[in-house]
C-alpha cells in the first residue's frame, strides 16, 4: 500500500501534477489518498508527501520514528514551473526517498542533465561579502532550527569580518521562488565570496556560478560542500557537474510521472 497525504479538497493544487501520475503508475501496490491535515496512523506501508504543508512535518516525523519508507515531492532543482508559461514537459517536480531532498548518486550519465541549459562556471577566487540564503520557515522548523538565520549570522561574525548580505526567500502573488525576486540571485552572486544556506535550492545556482557554498548537514548540497561555518574564509569548491547529474535523475515532469518514466528511472536507480 502507498498512502499519499494530499489536500483532497484542493483539486487545483499542483500536487496533483505528481499524484495523478503516481496513482496510475506506482508498481505492485494499491494507492490510497488521505487528507494531510490528519494525524499519521501507524501502518506498514510507504507514504508520500507534497512539501511541508498542513500537518506533513509532524506526519513525516512519525513515519521516520516508526522506520517506514516515505517519498517526498516538491519543487525541482532546475526546470521550475512558470505560471505564465505552463506547457507539457516544460517543468519538473522532485521526488526523494526517506528525505526531503535528493540523495547523491554518483557517476550517472548526462542524458537528463542535457535537457537543461546549465552552464558551470569556473570557481571564483574573490568576493566582497557573504551571501546568506535562508530556507523557508517551514524547512527550519523541520530541521529543528527555527533560529537558524540569527544563529548563523552570530557564528559567521566569529570567523570573519567580511560584510554579510541576507537574501530572504522571494515571495509574492501567492507563490515563492525566482519569479518573485526583485533582484535575481545571479546578480547577488556576482560579488559574493560564498553562499551560506540551510537547505535552499540557491545552492544549485551558487555552485554553477562558481561560488562556494556552506550548507546545513541536512542539505542536498552536503555531499560536495562544507557544512561548518568555520570554513567561511576558505570554503571548499567541488566541480558540481556529477552532482547535477544526480539531481536531474530525481526530478520529473508531470507527463513523466504519468507515463511511467519516473517509476522506471527510480527502479533503475534502485530507489524503488
What are these regions (language model features)?
Residues 84-127, 223-272:
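Leloir-type glycosyltransferase catalytic cores
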Residues 45-48, 129, 193-194:
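Structural motif
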Residues 1-50, 138-139, 265-272:
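N-terminal pre-catalytic "stem/leader" segment of glycosyltransferase-like enzymes
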Residues 15-23, 56-57, 145-159:
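Well-ordered, non-membrane alpha-helical segments in soluble/globular domains
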Residues 9-11, 53-55, 76-79, 135-139, ...:
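Short, solvent-exposed loop/turn segments at secondary-structure junctions
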Residues 32-85:
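Extended catalytic core of nucleotide-activated donor transferases of GT-like folds
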Amino acid at each position: 500500500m502507498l498512502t499519499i497525504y494530499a489536500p483532497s479538497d484542493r483539486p487545483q493544487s499542483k500536487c496533483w501534477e505528481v499524484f495523478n501520475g503516481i496513482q496510475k503508475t506506482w508498481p505492485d501496490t494499491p494507492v490510497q489518498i488521505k487528507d494531510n491535515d490528519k494525524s499519521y496512523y501507524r501502518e506498514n506501508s510507504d507514504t508520500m508527501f507534497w512539501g511541508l504543508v498542513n500537518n506533513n512535518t509532524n506526519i513525516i516525523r512519525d513515519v521516520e520514528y516508526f522506520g517506514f519508507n516515505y517519498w517526498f515531492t516538491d519543487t525541482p532543482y532546475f526546470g521550475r514551473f512558470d505560471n505564465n508559461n505552463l506547457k507539457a514537459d516544460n517543468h519538473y517536480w522532485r521526488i526523494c526517498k526517506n528525505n526531503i531532498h535528493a540523495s547523491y548518486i554518483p557517476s550517472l550519465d548526462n542524458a537528463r542533465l542535457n535537457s537543461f541549459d546549465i552552464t558551470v562556471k569556473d570557481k571564483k577566487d574573490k568576493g566582497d561579502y557573504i551571501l546568506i540564503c535562508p530556507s523557508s520557515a517551514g524547512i527550519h522548523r523541520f530541521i529543528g532550527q527555527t533560529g537558524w538565520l540569527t544563529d548563523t549570522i552570530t557564528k559567521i561574525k566569529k570567523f570573519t569580518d567580511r560584510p554579510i548580505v541576507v537574501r530572504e526567500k522571494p515571495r509574492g502573488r501567492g507563490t515563492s521562488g525566482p519569479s518573485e525576486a526583485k533582484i535575481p540571485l545571479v546578480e547577488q552572486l556576482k560579488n559574493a565570496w560564498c553562499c551560506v544556506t540551510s537547505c535552499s535550492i540557491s545552492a544549485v545556482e551558487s555552485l554553477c556560478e562558481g561560488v562556494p557554498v556552506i550548507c546545513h548537514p541536512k542539505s542536498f548540497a552536503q555531499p560536495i560542500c562544507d557544512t561548518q561555518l568555520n570554513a567561511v574564509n576558505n570554503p571548499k569548491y567541488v566541480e558540481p557537474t556529477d552532482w547535477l547529474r544526480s539531481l536531474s535523475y530525481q526530478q520529473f515532469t508531470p507527463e513523466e510521472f504519468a507515463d511511467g518514466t519516473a517509476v522506471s528511472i527510480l527502479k533503475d536507480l534502485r530507489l524503488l
